[in-house]
């Protein structure tokens, strides 16, 4: 059976914060959006990897979780009726003779749109796993590479391994609810915010947690339940650490996947864009958020919001070259307020 083609103004690849806010900005310009995401829910990396981790640099929100931010963005986009397609990976993006784009997914969906916006974060992320023999047997049971629900770890004896921001942040955020908290790193220098490092050292001094120097060489347990680990200390001696949960945080590996085959210019697995339109090397194909690169780029959610606003203006002009675009403010425009359902 032939899949019916879905016709729309815009296809957004990625339903993370930048993709969701792009719906709002495009909606103000009467552009209808379909979003496609490989995950089974909205929020992208923000919701998948750290849904309960506090975010502190969203304007007007002193602190917000990834989950709450996603919910608010969904609510903000709702008046424009976006359509979401989860568990779908965009495999092919092809420009048609009439200037529109044909987008195909691995699940058989076919779209035709005037504009395509790539808001796929860094592509798909996979955790870098430590080279510990047999760790696969514990994964998802007592070894976890991300904290999706803090309550999962309440009352546990947790060992966190790593020296970056994720390791330090979760050491600090989880310690109030766990039975015991231990952190292990191969050296006493950290690749994390100095404030987080200071907080961790303070917890150690207050005997609220322990810090170890060394590397984990083996795991001990039964039927996927961890009971402890063997560590080779920096002095070369082996010793044991008792724990029932291990959180290794060694960073993420980014994979572009099919994006690399879409015929657009790439630079170090990122998509170069201009900072006026956030357009790629292909007219009508835009990129916002962590997937793009330009001089002075900051990989921040708030930067992606700015990019979405400018992209939307350029996307409208590309899709409607003969239309007049009058800039309006939501605070004073009755027509925009009607679209938002507040007038």
Curated annotation (Swiss-Prot):
The keyword Flavoprotein applies. One of its GO terms (molecular function) is flavin adenine dinucleotide binding. InterPro entries: FAD/NAD-bd_sf (IPR036188), FAD/NAD-binding_dom (IPR023753), Fd--NADP_Rdtase_type_2 (IPR022890), Ferredoxin-NADP_redctase_2 (IPR050097). It is an enzyme of class 1 (oxidoreductase). Its EC number is 1.18.1.2. It catalyses: 2 reduced [2Fe-2S]-[ferredoxin] + NADP(+) + H(+) = 2 oxidized [2Fe-2S]-[ferredoxin] + NADPH. Coiled coil: none annotated. The keyword NADP applies. FAD binds at residues 18, 37, 45, 50, 90, 125, 290, 331. Binds 1 FAD per subunit. Its cofactor is FAD. Keywords: FAD, Flavoprotein, NADP, Oxidoreductase. It comes from the Bacteria. Gene3D superfamilies: FAD/NAD(P)-binding domain. Homodimer. HAMAP family: FENR2 (MF_01685). Belongs to the ferredoxin--NADP reductase type 2 family. This is Ferredoxin--NADP reductase. The lineage of its organism: Bacteria, Pseudomonadati, Pseudomonadota, Alphaproteobacteria, Hyphomicrobiales.
């Amino acid at each position: 059976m032939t899949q019916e083609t879905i016709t729309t103004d815009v296809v957004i690849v990625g339903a993370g914060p930048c993709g969701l806010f792009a719906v709002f900005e495009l909606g103000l310009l009467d552009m209808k959006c379909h979003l496609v995401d490989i995950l089974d829910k909205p929020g992208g990396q923000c919701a998948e990897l750290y849904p309960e981790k506090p975010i502190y640099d969203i304007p007007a929100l002193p602190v917000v979780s990834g989950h709450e931010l996603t919910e608010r963005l969904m609510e903000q986009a709702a008046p424009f009726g976006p359509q979401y397609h989860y568990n779908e990976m965009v495999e092919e993006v092809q420009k048609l003779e009439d200037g529109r784009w044909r987008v195909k997914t691995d699940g058989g969906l076919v779209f035709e749109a005037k504009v395509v916006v790539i808001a796929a974060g860094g592509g798909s992320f996979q955790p870098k796993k430590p080279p510990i023999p047999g760790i696969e047997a514990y994964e998802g049971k007592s070894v976890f590479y991300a904290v999706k629900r803090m309550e999962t770890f309440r009352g546990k004896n947790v060992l966190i391994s790593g020296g970056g921001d994720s390791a330090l942040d979760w050491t600090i955020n989880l310690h109030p609810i766990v039975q015991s908290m231990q952190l292990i790193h191969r050296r006493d220098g950290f690749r994390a915010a100095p404030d987080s490092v200071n907080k961790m050292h303070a917890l150690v001094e207050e005997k609220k947690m322990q810090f170890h120097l060394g590397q984990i060489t083996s795991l001990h347990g039964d039927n996927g339940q961890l009971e402890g680990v063997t560590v080779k200390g920096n002095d070369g001696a082996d010793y044991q650490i008792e724990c029932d949960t291990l959180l290794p945080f060694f960073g993420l590996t980014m994979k572009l996947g099919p994006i690399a085959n879409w015929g657009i210019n790439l630079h170090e697995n990122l998509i170069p864009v201009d900072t006026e339109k956030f357009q790629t090397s292909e007219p009508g194909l835009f990129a916002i958020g962590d997937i793009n690169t330009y001089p002075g780029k900051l990989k921040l959610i708030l930067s992606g919001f700015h990019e979405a606003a400018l992209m939307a203006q350029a996307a409208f002009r590309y899709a409607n070259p003969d239309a007049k675009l009058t800039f309006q403010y939501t605070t004073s425009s009755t027509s925009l307020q009607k679209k938002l359902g507040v007038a």
